[in-house]
From Swiss-Prot:
Subunit (UniProt): PSII is composed of 1 copy each of membrane proteins PsbA, PsbB, PsbC, PsbD, PsbE, PsbF, PsbH, PsbI, PsbJ, PsbK, PsbL, PsbM, PsbT, PsbX, PsbY, PsbZ, Psb30/Ycf12, at least 3 peripheral proteins of the oxygen-evolving complex and a large number of cofactors. It forms dimeric complexes.
Organism, as annotated: Phaeodactylum tricornutum (strain CCAP 1055/1)
Keyword Membrane: yes
Keywords, sorted A to Z: Chloroplast, Membrane, Photosynthesis, Photosystem II, Plastid, Thylakoid, Transmembrane, Transmembrane helix
A Pfam family annotated for this UniProt entry: PsbX
Subcellular compartments: Plastid, Chloroplast thylakoid membrane
Descriptive protein name: Photosystem II reaction center protein X
Gene Ontology process terms (BP): photosynthesis
Role noted for this protein: Involved in the binding and/or turnover of quinones at the Q(B) site of photosystem II (PSII). PSII is a light-driven water plastoquinone oxidoreductase, using light energy to abstract electrons from H(2)O, generating a proton gradient subsequently used for ATP formation.
Amino acid sequence: MTPSLGSFIASLFAGAFIALAIGGVLVFISQSDRVTRS
């Protein structure tokens, strides 16, 4: 595996991890915030 391919795959994993983290935070906020919004 070439270094450029390795860094590309690493950036893909990093981006997926960040997207999942942001998604999890948004879901957590929407779940805990439901009472105040209704």
